[in-house]
Amino acid sequence: MSPLLKSIIDIIEIFNQYASHDCDGAVLKKKDLKILLDREFGAVLQRPHDPETVDVMLELLDRDSDGLVGFDEFCLLIFKLAQAAYYALGQASGLDEEKRSHGEGKGRLLQNRRQEDQRRFELRDRQFEDEPERRRWQKQEQERELAEEEEQRKKRERFEQHYSRQYRDKEQRLQRQELEERRAEEEQLRRRKGRDAEEFIEEEQLRRREQQELKRELREEEQQRRERREQHERALQEEEEQLLRQRRWREEPREQQQLRRELEEIREREQRLEQEERREQQLRREQRLEQEERREQQLRRELEEIREREQRLEQEERREQRLEQEERREQQLKRELEEIREREQRLEQEERREQLLAEEVREQARERGESLTRRWQRQLESEAGARQSKVYSRPRRQEEQSLRQDQERRQRQERERELEEQARRQQQWQAEEESERRRQRLSARPSLRERQLRAEERQEQEQRFREEEEQRRERRQELQFLEEEEQLQRRERAQQLQEEDSFQEDRERRRRQQEQRPGQTWRWQLQEEAQRRRHTLYAKPGQQEQLREEEELQREKRRQEREREYREEEKLQREEDEKRRRQERERQYRELEELRQEEQLRDRKLREEEQLLQEREEERLRRQERERKLREEEQLLRQEEQELRQERERKLREEEQLLRREEQELRQERERKLREEEQLLQEREEERLRRQERARKLREEEQLLRQEEQELRQERERKLREEEQLLRREEQLLRQERDRKLREEEQLLQESEEERLRRQEREQQLRRERDRKFREEEQLLQEREEERLRRQERERKLREEEQLLQEREEERLRRQERERKLREEEQLLQEREEERLRRQERERKLREEEQLLRQEEQELRQERARKLREEEQLLRQEEQELRQERDRKLREEEQLLRQEEQELRQERDRKLREEEQLLQESEEERLRRQERERKLREEEQLLRREEQELRRERARKLREEEQLLQEREEERLRRQERARKLREEEQLLRREEQELRQERDRKFREEEQLLQEREEERLRRQERDRKFREEERQLRRQELEEQFRQERDRKFRLEEQIRQEKEEKQLRRQERDRKFREEEQQRRRQEREQQLRRERDRKFREEEQLLQEREEERLRRQERARKLREEEQLLRREEQLLRQERDRKFREEEQLLQESEEERLRRQERERKLREEEQLLQEREEERLRRQERARKLREEEQLLRQEEQELRQERARKLREEEQLLRQEEQELRQERDRKFREEEQLLRREEQELRRERDRKFREEEQLLQEREEERLRRQERARKLREEEEQLLFEEQEEQRLRQERDRRYRAEEQFAREEKSRRLERELRQEEEQRRRRERERKFREEQLRRQQEEEQRRRQLRERQFREDQSRRQVLEPGTRQFARVPVRSSPLYEYIQEQRSQYRP
């Protein structure tokens, strides 16, 4: 490789080594330039560490003024330094020797080649000296060879450039990848502080090794390419040389051929030497490259560590510098504003002083003057001066107005920048939180997804970093532009002040000259008049005519002289006016140019903002796409879970089908026995009829009891508060009595059945026992079915509650989303608060004051937080009471179900223990039943656990929400406390107070209307809930639009404040605003709205207190009615349960028979665990018996029955053991026959069941007739049902009350937002009106200025006419005047045109 290419590659590598790689490409920042100058040019520069050196170099190199140094600008630095170095070396004495010594080692081969070429051409010249044709041929040959060599050289250079470019691109790509990977590694290391650090380090080491291997392979490939290229070049050179030799051999004589052969041999030797040297150089290069690679790796490692440290330090320094710069800028802007104000005040004071001096001078001039003409002159001059001061004061006013406008524009730009930065940071934090959430969601997913997410996060972070850099760059440029504008404005102001001073001096000088000139002219006129009078007195009449002619000539001359002087003065005045106008035009042109530039800058910024918005929109769309994918994945997971649920349910259904089959088999077996025992069925029907008769009697008793309870309830309504507990006790006693009667009747039935069974034979006893067991099993199945239906009802209710909870969860999620945004804002504020605290650590006094303020704020916050916590605690207590009430009801229902289940289990177990030794099949069936019940209990336990977990989860989420609300409320109170100090001063303004009063009155009226419409709102609430989501979306859009509108409104308000409020109060407010603007500029709008909301909430709470006092009685009445309705509902439920039991028994007997057959299969599975569960059940029964005091009598009766049953068992056991073998044999035969007679028995059973159903339907119709006869009772039931429905509606209302309160809060929030929007629209209208008024005012001022100019022109024209007319009148008057002193006594004072002109001017300016 040539030294030139090597030096170029070294320059490129050095640049890439120190450059920062962004989206704009590789550029040198100020810090990078500092490091480069320190390390690479430390020996050349005098002071490389000095920041001024870096600033000077940056200003010299940064041609495009973007604060960054590109590669072309870096090359400019290299060329300048090289030029300076060569110039310094050329000045030295030993430059040639150094060059020779330096070139001897490198260019030895080239010198030998040149010497050989010279020898060869000298021989050729000697041979062809006398032959001109040979010379010409030689020249042509040389030119051709040179051209071919040039082409080959160009090819080689192009080839080398191509490969060097490829190599450079690869190196840059690798460096970029390294940088990106380093950044990604840093970020990942930061994120992974505590998790999988060792695995991450190992992965990173593997990745680095892979990268190093890739680099090494790339270098090897590059080296192989270079070798191939060199071989190819050598082959090309050899081929070309062979072709050249062949041509020369053909054309040259033998002697020359010999010479050429010798030369070629010499060249071949040289080439061999060159090849050997190249190989040696290549080996050295390879060794050097390996050493350099090792060094580079070490350096890179060290540099990586250094860069990591430096980056951390840089980030901290940048933050501190940014904060300090912002503080400095703010202080500088503040100082500049104060200086501008002071200058304006000084200018105004100087103008006042000048005016006072001018007035004093004029007064002195007036006092000095004695003649009337001087007074008239002074009056004219004073009026002209007033007009001129008006004319010249206008530019000054315009200048002040332009300064204010510039200041306002600057403040607007600063606010816009701050808001944009806040919005950008907010979006950035939102994106970071979203990425964090995605990472948390996908933490359990495959590593490929993690890599994709990491890559996306890396790209997003790089993009954010680039955007921050661009925004910083733009901010620096804007600040530079603003500083330049301010400097230009200062220069223009100084220039204008100088011009005004010079103009005032010229005006004063002219005024003095004019004051002196009239006195001289009048003295000269007086002398002439005296001479003329003397001549007229003593001259002859002929001479008088001559004298008159001479006087006329003199008058004409004087008039011409005055006119000439007047024209000269007018010409000077015009020139000055034109000069002034030209300056004004130039200034206006410059201002227009500046405005155009500003507009161009604004347009460019707007375009950039639009581009940023588009990019953000694209990012948002990408984010939405990612979220959509995540939602799809979650949906897939839900579908999988649903499929699993369906699979589980399918298995359960299959198990139930198996149980049904078993029960069906059992039923078939029983049906075969039932056909043999038709008589027993008849007896059973009689027993069933008796039971129905008993049930009818019980219903009649219950109806009587209900009537009594209704009467008691009516009595209770009158004395509800005093007798609530008594009524509950009476109801409990009544229920206990009713239950006791039912149990006694059941016991009597059982005793009658047992007596009847004892009377009959043992075979009939066994059959009856089996039938009784069958009936009991049917009853158990019916009860289980009822229990299953109740469970389904509970599950349905639970699903409805879950659906409600899901809706609430969605609302909570939306609330969490809003709260998350608020938390993000609060996090922003917290970070700013931390930065502010770090700043305040340096300022001890401010910290102490702020600590005091914080303590006061904290006390206020604690007080408010305490009140809010009390309110929230009350709400929580209400919610908790509602939950407890609901849970209590569920627990009561569950307890009732458990008691029923336990009683059923006890009865079943008792009977199973009696027949334990008699029937093994019955034991197996019982075991299967217990197994199924165990599974059901386990499922119920699982359901209960799930419900408990859901409740705990809900409670935990509610606690978290409440905690978040508390934190948010505390933070909001802090913000409110901070904003309160600012708002106290703003509320002092009368206009805002009046508007707020009007707005409050209007809001108060609207809230009264809202309170009246609340009942109507309750009916529309369901429809409103459906539209709530759509409204939220629209609200989000409107919030974005409102943000822009509010930003615009805020700008207009600030402009209006700046225009209207010029007093010290506003300056103090602006100073305070500036202190708080860094932290609360974006929140000010929200806090204002929150203040209005708090004010409205306070009034609303006061109104609500009044309304609550009115509604307390209504609520108490509702509470009484609710309790009555609850009692009636319980009674109605009991009635309904009895009715449902009766109806369900008639409808579902067939289904229960099938399920009894299915249950037989389950019983076979339960046989294995019978004994263990029996022991557990016995223990539970003992505990339950100990607990249940009210069932003591029942247990005693059961013990008696058990003793009797035990005696019966002993008697039975003796005979059953004998019959057991027979039964087993029969069962085996029956099992064989069962498969054969399955369908026949099933058909017979169906027929019998149909007959039974008909009988039941007939009896059911009879009972319906009885029910129709009791229409009054039904009406009362309907009345109770209506009351219970109202009660249910009230319960629903109470359950929805919490939701309504939330919706009411949301509605209030929306109403407040609507109120804020209306207020903003009113403010906009007011501001538009003000703008319209200002525009009209400006139009009036413009018209007034035009009118003034027109009047000035007319006045000038009128003055000319007056002067001409006055001149003519003077001439005529002088001709008419007679000689004598009487001429001066009749001076025209009242009738002069000058006096008329003065009077006209006075009338114009008179108020």
Swiss-Prot record:
Stretches the record annotates as Disordered: 148-172, 218-237, 362-471, 486-587, 1014-1033, 1062-1082, 1313-1407
Residue span of region S-100-like: 1-91
Keyword Metal-binding assigned: yes
PROSITE patterns, per database record: EF_HAND_1 (PS00018), EF_HAND_2 (PS50222), S100_CABP (PS00303)
PTM comment text: Substrate of transglutaminase. Some 200 arginines are probably converted to citrullines by peptidylarginine deimidase.
Keywords: Calcium, Citrullination, Keratinization, Metal-binding, Repeat
Gene3D superfamilies to which the protein is assigned, alphabetical: EF-hand (1.10.238.10)
Single GO MF descriptor: transition metal ion binding
Domain EF-hand: residue ranges: 23-48, 49-84
Entry-linked InterPro entries: EF-hand-dom_pair, EF_Hand_1_Ca_BS, EF_hand_dom, S-100_dom, S100/CaBP7/8-like_CS, S100_Ca-bd_sub, TCHH
SMART domains listed in its UniProt record: S_100
Biological processes annotated in GO: intermediate filament organization; keratinization
Cited SUPFAM superfamilies: EF-hand
Annotated tissue distribution: Found in the hard keratinizing tissues such as the inner root sheath (IRS) of hair follicles and medulla, and in the filiform papillae of dorsal tongue epithelium.
Residue sites binding Ca(2+) 1 per the record: 32
Binding-site residues for Ca(2+) 2, renumbered to this chain: 62, 64, 66, 73
Biased composition range(s): Basic and acidic residues: 362-381, 396-424, 447-471, 554-587, 1313-1376
Pfam families hit by this protein: S_100 (PF01023)
Subunit-structure text: Homodimer.
Domain notes: Consists of nine domains. Domain 1 contains two EF-hand calcium-binding domains. Domains 2-4, 6, and 8 are almost entirely alpha-helical, configured as a series of peptide repeats of varying regularity, and are thought to form a single-stranded alpha-helical rod stabilized by ionic interactions. Domain 6 is the most regular and may bind KIF directly by ionic interactions. Domains 5 and 7 are less well organized and may induce folds in the molecule. Domain 9 contains the C-terminus, conserved among different species.
Protein's job: Intermediate filament-associated protein that associates in regular arrays with keratin intermediate filaments (KIF) of the inner root sheath cells of the hair follicle and the granular layer of the epidermis. It later becomes cross-linked to KIF by isodipeptide bonds. It may serve as scaffold protein, together with involucrin, in the organization of the cell envelope or even anchor the cell envelope to the KIF network. It may be involved in its own calcium-dependent postsynthetic processing during terminal differentiation.
Family of this protein: Belongs to the S100-fused protein family.
Name of the molecule in the record: Trichohyalin
Species, as recorded: Oryctolagus cuniculus
Gene: TCHH
